[in-house]
Amino acid sequence: MKQYLGLCQRIVDKGIWIENQRTGKRCLTVINADLEYDVGNNQFPMITTRKSFYKSAIAELIGYLRGYDNAADFRKLGTKTWDANSNLNNAWLNNPYRKGEDDMGRVYGIQGRSWAKPDGGFIDQLKKVVDDLSNGIDDRGEIVTFYNPGEFEMGCLRPCMHTHTFSLLGDTLHLTSYQRSCDVPLGLNFNQVQVFALLALMAQITGKKAGMAYHKIVNAHIYEDQLALMRDVQLPRLPFASPQLKINPKIKSLQDLETWVTMDDFEVEGYQCHDAIKYPFSV
């Protein structure tokens, strides 16, 4: 929590106002933020200075790992995070690549599981990484990236957290996740949960020990209509101790994640928090 609150305070104190063309709002912005999560010791980075929810974030992550491209599939998993971007984004609604209601296009998981090749074939980046790590292989290129500029126009949103690099040191697995843009009051809690859970799950299904997750953010910002709530309500609150994330030990393979895993397979223990804060969301 200290590093999260430190980033929030840094934005409030030192951020620069930038006009965001997509949303039409100003953002108080800083460049470069590095966060670290101790996954090996299960220090789950769930925000305690406001009520936070982890299952929706993990549901979204599972949807990415399965290669989903439809908001309805994410809703079935337990998250509505793609409803707005797939159905309320005017640019996407008028995009000829949009296939209909709830369609997200070629974003996130589609790129991770089905990256299009020039010859008409596809690359399953995630399976390659899982197979390598399961066999104790780290070729210094154990990377899953969702960032495909050649297909940006074919999706409703460019990826924010776009690349995940896995590193194997002995039998301990580490993760470095890269994020180009972060709505800190709303999105960062989701992103922290996902980075932590991704390393925990990948270590579990490849038979490795989980180590550290390194979360690198380029553009970290607070929207103008979020600033007062962050500065005057959330930042003055004292954080509670970190909770722990419990994952069903029966999850042993990528196929398990693709088929039967639900949010009932995840539980948080020891979570204490302050009251909820309703931050505005910008589509």
Swiss-Prot record:
Homodimer. Its EC number is 2.1.1.45. It is found in: Cytoplasm. This is Thymidylate synthase. GO terms for cellular component: cytosol. (6R)-5,10-methylene-5,6,7,8-tetrahydrofolate binds at residues 183, 282. Its main location: cytoplasm. Keywords: Cytoplasm, Methyltransferase, Nucleotide biosynthesis, Transferase. Catalyzes the reductive methylation of 2'-deoxyuridine-5'-monophosphate (dUMP) to 2'-deoxythymidine-5'-monophosphate (dTMP) while utilizing 5,10-methylenetetrahydrofolate (mTHF) as the methyl donor and reductant in the reaction, yielding dihydrofolate (DHF) as a by-product. This enzymatic reaction provides an intracellular de novo source of dTMP, an essential precursor for DNA biosynthesis. The active site is at residue 160. The keyword Transferase applies. It comes from the Bacteria. The keyword Acetylation does not apply. InterPro entries: Thymidate_synth/dCMP_Mease, Thymidate_synth/dCMP_Mease_dom, Thymidate_synth/dCMP_Mease_sf, Thymidylate_synthase, Thymidylate_synthase_AS. It is an enzyme of class 2 (transferase). It catalyses: dUMP + (6R)-5,10-methylene-5,6,7,8-tetrahydrofolate = 7,8-dihydrofolate + dTMP. The lineage of its organism: Bacteria, Pseudomonadati, Pseudomonadota, Gammaproteobacteria, Alteromonadales. Pathway: Pyrimidine metabolism; dTTP biosynthesis. DUMP binds at residues 22, 180-183, 191, 221-223. One of its GO terms (biological process) is methylation. Belongs to the thymidylate synthase family. Bacterial-type ThyA subfamily.
